[in-house]
Regions:
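Surface-exposed, charge/polar-rich loops and edge strands
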Residues: 1-119
Length: 119
């Protein structure tokens, strides 16, 4: 899986910790944000700043922080489809994609979006 750079300000870390302490949900807008947050919160000590992740999320991964994801429809058999399948379950994603194809949703970067919750 490719690596991605990201920056997380102190304020964001505080907001996430506050939301989680109140049983709030964390919603990632895009797979880059999901990978960044899961990578950041897998560290023993969480620090703000510029970071890089090459985390490869696949079925069996235990999600630590993200509860829901807004993302586009990814290519089947791609690493990002594997990520969303790990997040919401392979069967759920297969049904979702069958529905999207049947209803002529647009795929890829400039296509339709989907909101999925962690299984």
């Amino acid at each position: 899986m490719h690596s991605e750079s990201f920056n997380v300000p102190d304020k964001t870390i505080h907001m996430i910790n506050d939301a989680k302490s109140k049983n709030g949900r964390i919603i990632a807008i895009g797979t880059t944000v999901l990978r960044a947050l899961e990578s950041l919160f897998s560290e023993e000590t969480i620090h703000s700043g510029f970071k890089e992740t090459s985390i490869f999320i696949k079925p069996g991964y235990t999600f630590k922080i993200v509860d829901a994801l807004l993302t586009n429809f990814h290519l089947p058999k791609s690493t990002l489809f594997i990520l969303v399948s790990a997040f919401s379950g392979s069967d759920t994603m297969k049904r979702l994609y069958q529905h999207a194809i049947k209803n002529e949703y647009r795929f890829f970067s400039y296509g339709d979006a989907t909101f999925i919750e962690r299984s």
